[in-house]
């Protein structure tokens, strides 16, 4: 497999791992927390849109489509399903219609940034996430679902 594609797949797995930690044990009403700009559910919807856009751009359709947020559990599911579809495309031999570097520097980097934003909002909402050493985390390409391995070195 192409090294660039494989690295982008590892990046998607990293995104899935970090987001799953951010969403894990979030209060039921966290998606509607307000007081810091967009609500978490709106941010998560945007993140799902970014991943769909990355997938579609890689397939040759770079048109942007913003969606209305779904309820929190469905929005989380939509994100991870979009991530799995994009990962499957990268794992295939289908030629990409966009440079891997651009897919990383645009939608994927943006989604990683928003993952950190959601983690900060968890703290603002009074429900901080537990820290861990992400360098030691058991992250592997293709592991892009919401179910992730347990932390190797939690704080």
Label each PLM-derived region with a short phrase.
Residues 1-2:
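Short, contiguous pre-domain boundary segments
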Residues 5, 9-23, 28-66, 98-155:
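Short, contiguous alpha-helical
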Residues 53-93:
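Helix-adjacent hinge/juxtasegments
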């Amino acid at each position: 497999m192409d090294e660039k594609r494989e690295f982008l797949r590892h990046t998607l797995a990293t995104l899935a791992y970090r987001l799953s930690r951010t969403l894990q044990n979030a209060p039921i009403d966290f998606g509607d927390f307000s007081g810091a700009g967009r609500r978490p559910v709106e941010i998560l919807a945007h993140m799902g849109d970014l991943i769909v856009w990355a997938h579609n751009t890689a397939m040759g359709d770079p048109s942007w489509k913003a969606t209305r947020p779904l309820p929190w559990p469905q929005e989380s599911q939509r994100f991870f399903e979009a991530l799995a579809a994009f990962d499957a495309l990268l794992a295939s031999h289908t030629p990409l219609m966009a440079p891997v570097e651009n897919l990383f520097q645009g939608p994927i980097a943006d989604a990683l940034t928003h993952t950190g934003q959601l983690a900060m909002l968890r703290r603002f909402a009074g429900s901080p996430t537990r820290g861990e050493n992400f360098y030691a985390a058991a992250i592997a390409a293709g592991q892009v679902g919401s179910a992730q391995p347990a932390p190797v070195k939690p704080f």
